[in-house]
């Protein structure tokens, strides 16, 4: 929005030309989103407490979690507000890629909101009926994916980038739709499963979003895309603004979510953030890189799949409890130790992911 205003005002003062630079707007988007999160956080928490929107806790979970029962949830609302306002202010809204991400972000946020509401209303951890939850997540993802495919089907925007391979970038064609669908829905649910400890999901989200800000900038810059041997996607550069808005909103939320948490993001936050990361990965053609950098999310999701599969096939559990962060808690690890170690692992994976851009 401010891009349009600056384009008009630059004729009166060339200083407004600074708004045309992605780096400037990226920094401002981060600061704006973080500022909004810090500002509205106390009021959002207070209203959630008044509405008695408290977290429900599984009775078979770690005993240390029982004290969390009643902690305000649905704090993801403040994340969505911060990202939305910051993006609308600092992004170039003529860019279709920005709208694709916002569509998934708020669409998944709406599904998460309903899911959280039913958990609170029923006073248990069962929210929206699973088949309806996945139905709406799928509908939103497919609408976005078909839109992305329509915009970029004849360009590098539908190539698959394989880490460590410089010249192997197959054109996916219609298979782009299938891959993108699973990336968006899968990432959304993986982040959702990771969100079980204070700050466990939001910090890896911040790290991965920070990395994707760099990748989006390189993907949207012809010279750097050529240098790194990645597809040049002209519209991708504007996603830097969205990525830094996610980082800023995440930092603002972490202020209140760090151990011991004053608020939880709930499904309204985790589903939307995961969906946004998946959509960004699709748009910059780095789905496989997301698997590396978001390795913690992948392992959390796999632990649930393996646990359920093992129990159904063998009537035996692989882990003491899934997702895997609860397994470590039941082994005696204090919650802060689990959280920080998962953060460290994510930092390592993000750095490895960034290095693969050059190791081809």
Curated annotation (Swiss-Prot):
Subcellular location: Cell inner membrane
Segments traversing the membrane: 21-41, 73-93, 98-118, 132-152, 168-188, 199-219, 236-256, 263-283, 288-308, 338-358
EC number per UniProt: 2.7.8.13
GO (cellular component) term, any one: plasma membrane
Gene Ontology terms for molecular function: metal ion binding; phospho-N-acetylmuramoyl-pentapeptide-transferase activity; UDP-N-acetylmuramoyl-L-alanyl-D-glutamyl-meso-2,6-diaminopimelyl-D-alanyl-D-alanine:undecaprenyl-phosphate transferase activity
Pfam family, any one: MraY_sig1
GO biological process: cell division; cell wall organization; peptidoglycan biosynthetic process; regulation of cell shape
Pathway: Cell wall biogenesis; peptidoglycan biosynthesis
Highest rank taxon of the organism: Bacteria
Cofactor(s) listed: Mg(2+)
Key word Ion transport present: no
Swiss-Prot/TrEMBL catalytic activity: UDP-N-acetyl-alpha-D-muramoyl-L-alanyl-gamma-D-glutamyl-meso-2,6-diaminopimeloyl-D-alanyl-D-alanine + di-trans,octa-cis-undecaprenyl phosphate = di-trans,octa-cis-undecaprenyl diphospho-N-acetyl-alpha-D-muramoyl-L-alanyl-D-glutamyl-meso-2,6-diaminopimeloyl-D-alanyl-D-alanine + UMP
Signal peptide: none
Topology with respect to the bilayer: Multi-pass membrane protein
Predominant localisation class: membrane
UniProt keyword Cell membrane present: yes
The family this protein is said to belong to: Belongs to the glycosyltransferase 4 family. MraY subfamily.
Stated role: Catalyzes the initial step of the lipid cycle reactions in the biosynthesis of the cell wall peptidoglycan: transfers peptidoglycan precursor phospho-MurNAc-pentapeptide from UDP-MurNAc-pentapeptide onto the lipid carrier undecaprenyl phosphate, yielding undecaprenyl-pyrophosphoryl-MurNAc-pentapeptide, known as lipid I.
Protein name: Phospho-N-acetylmuramoyl-pentapeptide-transferase
Annotated source species: Actinobacillus pleuropneumoniae serotype 3 (strain JL03)
Gene name for this UniProt entry: mraY
């Amino acid at each position: 929005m401010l891009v349009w205003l600056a384009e008009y005002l630059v004729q009166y003062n060339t200083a407004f030309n600074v708004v045309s630079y992605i780096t400037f707007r990226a920094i401002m988007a981060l600061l704006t989103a973080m500022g909004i999160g810090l500002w509205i956080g106390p009021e959002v928490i207070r209203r959630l407490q008044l509405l008695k929107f408290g977290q429900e806790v599984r009775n078979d979970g770690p005993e240390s979690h029982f004290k969390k029962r009643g902690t305000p949830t649905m704090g993801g609302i403040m994340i969505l507000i911060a990202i939305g306002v910051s993006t609308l202010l600092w992004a170039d809204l003529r860019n279709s890629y920005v709208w694709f991400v916002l569509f998934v972000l708020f669409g998944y946020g709406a599904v998460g909101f309903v899911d959280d509401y039913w958990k609170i209303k029923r006073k248990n951890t069962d929210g929206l009926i699973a088949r309806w939850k996945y139905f709406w997540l799928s509908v939103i993802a497919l609408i976005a994916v078909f839109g992305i495919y329509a915009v970029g089907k004849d360009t590098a925007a539908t190539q698959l980038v394989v880490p460590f391979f410089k010249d192997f970038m197959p054109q996916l064609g219609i298979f782009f739709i299938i891959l993108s669908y699973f990336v968006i829905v899968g990432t959304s649910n993986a982040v959702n499963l990771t969100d079980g400890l204070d700050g466990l999901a939001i910090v890896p989200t911040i790290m991965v979003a920070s990395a994707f800000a760099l990748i989006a900038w390189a993907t949207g810059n012809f010279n750097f895309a050529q240098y790194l041997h990645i597809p040049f996607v002209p519209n991708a550069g504007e996603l830097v603004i969205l990525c830094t808005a996610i980082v800023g909103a995440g930092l603002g939320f972490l202020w209140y979510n760090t151990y011991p948490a004053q608020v939880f993001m709930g499904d309204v936050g985790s589903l939307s953030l995961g969906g946004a990361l998946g959509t960004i990965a699709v748009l910059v053609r780095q789905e496989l890189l997301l698997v590396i950098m978001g390795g913690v999310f992948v392992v959390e999701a796999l632990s649930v799949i393996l646990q359920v599969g093992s129990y159904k096939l063998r009537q035996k559990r692989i882990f003491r409890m899934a997702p895997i962060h609860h397994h470590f808690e039941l082994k005696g690890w204090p919650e802060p130790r689990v959280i920080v170690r998962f953060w460290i692992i994510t930092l390592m994976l993000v750095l490895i992911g960034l290095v693969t851009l050059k190791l081809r």
